[in-house]
Amino acid sequence: MADKIERHTFKVFNQDFSVDKRFQLIKEIGHGAYGIVCSARFAEAAEDTTVAIKKVTNVFSKTLLCKRSLRELKLLRHFRGHKNITCLYDMDIVFYPDGSINGLYLYEELMECDMHQIIKSGQPLTDAHYQSFTYQILCGLKYIHSADVLHRDLKPGNLLVNADCQLKICDFGLARGYSENPVENSQFLTEYVATRWYRAPEIMLSYQGYTKAIDVWSAGCILAEFLGGKPIFKGKDYVNQLNQILQVLGTPPDETLRRIGSKNVQDYIHQLGFIPKVPFVNLYPNANSQALDLLEQMLAFDPQKRITVDEALEHPYLSIWHDPADEPVCSEKFEFSFESVNDMEDLKQMVIQEVQDFRLFVRQPLLEEQRQLQLQQQQQQQQQQQQQQQQPSDVDNGNAAASEENYPKQMATSNSVAPQQESFGIHSQNLPRHDADFPPRPQESMMEMRPATGNTADIPPQNDNGTLLDLEKELEFGLDRKYF
């Protein structure tokens, strides 16, 4: 159903925002390579209602970015309603008079800050905070994984938080599908590699296929960051990243090393010699012993020995929060068939259709409510007409008036959320902005780097032992290198 939207335009970080005129700008929030975000107030709401409006930039400049946007739109719709995943309220796509696209706008749940800002602020956090945050991350992951989706870019900057410690996972642009069948799983080609500091070692080491364990590793890195106040593995490049992991976890056993898909990387690790493991209690002497036990299992080098999300939720460290009845799974698997589409015009039409479908999806309950309202009005009018025909004209019409007065109350609906547990909070105001200490951005994959013309002039030369890439590039691209 096509609905007319009256828009107005204002500036956000010197870029035009053309949005529904009922939304009034509050302030600029942030901007990056893929979008610009502001907060806005919905002027027609009975209560103060604010949202985050994100303008996705450069959506149709590259196939890679278009597919990333389409992926995020579909996933936010699929996961809509889970308490630990950011909620997409609405979306809009604005066209120029000539039919070209002006911008894609997402109207999302407004959260007060992200976890990177909280950690960077240095405000005192307690073990109760760590338990609550870790539990909420795992609840969100359980729901995501149950739909056969891997997030692939969990990091503090992608965890949105409110002052009451409510946490929500965001940014699904790098997500990908997962199958227990290795053959099917290998077909989910990735377009990006995840952020280096939180990237599981099996991705760098070219293990045979990704598993859900990669997100558990990232969550473990975040737990370590809670305990230490800084990233546990802060590599300046991918070789240094591997070195930092080995310096803490020690040299993996031979059975694990044999599963590394690159002989070049195997040789490098052997050349380092034996590296002893550093007990986590040495790194975090003041931490809860149960937190360290959970961390030990989340940061197992071998993904086959790493704790699962379900097991982690049952760990004693999280027992104060664990409630199986309040840890739902997604009712449907996510469909990744759109990933095989590579024609830009086809992808553009899919984005437009997704926006139209979502707008109808979120408006359907309102349309049904309006239909019920009209039906009730018609029934009331019919009843009043019948009463007037049956009763003398001088009969008091107080009952009808009372019915009309009560009518709005009968139709009133509550959008309130159950109150959160009040025990502790965080300071979410005047936090530091993202700076040079922010994790490096995920890099584009080799699939995108490959020349579209088939010209190999820009492909890096092979080195002496016949490998296509040097050690740094092998670790950076991991499994993607075999598709180059």
From Swiss-Prot:
SMART domains: S_TKc
Keywords: ATP-binding, Kinase, Nucleotide-binding, Phosphoprotein, Serine/threonine-protein kinase, Transferase
Sites bearing Phosphotyrosine, chain numbering: Y192
Domain Protein kinase residues, every copy: 23-318
Pfam families (alphabetical): Pkinase
Post-translational modification: Dually phosphorylated on Thr-190 and Tyr-192, which activates the enzyme.
The protein's enzyme class: transferase
Keyword Transferase carried by entry: yes
Modes of activity regulation: Activated by tyrosine and threonine phosphorylation by MKK1 and MKK2.
Key word Transferase present: yes
Catalytic activity, reaction form: L-seryl-[protein] + ATP = O-phospho-L-seryl-[protein] + ADP + H(+); L-threonyl-[protein] + ATP = O-phospho-L-threonyl-[protein] + ADP + H(+)
Residue positions where Phosphothreonine is found in the record: T190
Binding site for ATP: I29, G30, H31, G32, A33, Y34, G35, I36, V37, K54
Enzyme Commission number, as recorded: 2.7.11.24
Essential cofactor(s): Mg(2+)
Biased composition (Low complexity): 383-392
Alphabetical list of Gene3D superfamilies matching this protein: Phosphorylase Kinase, domain 1, Transferase(Phosphotransferase) domain 1
Catalytic residues of the enzyme: D153 (proton acceptor)
Entry-linked PANTHER family: MITOGEN-ACTIVATED PROTEIN KINASE (PTHR24055)
Function: Serine/threonine protein kinase involved in a signal transduction pathway that plays a role in yeast cell morphogenesis and cell growth. This pathway seems to start by SMP3; then involve the kinase PKC1 that may act the BCK1 kinase that then phosphorylates MKK1 and MKK2 which themselves phosphorylate the SLT2/MPK1 kinase which itself then phosphorylates and activates the transcription factor RLM1. Directly phosphorylates BCY1 upon TOR complex 1 (TORC1) inhibition.
Misc remark: Present with 3230 molecules/cell in log phase SD medium.
Name assigned to this protein: Mitogen-activated protein kinase SLT2/MPK1
Organism of provenance: Saccharomyces cerevisiae (strain ATCC 204508 / S288c) (Baker's yeast)
Gene transcribed to yield this protein: SLT2
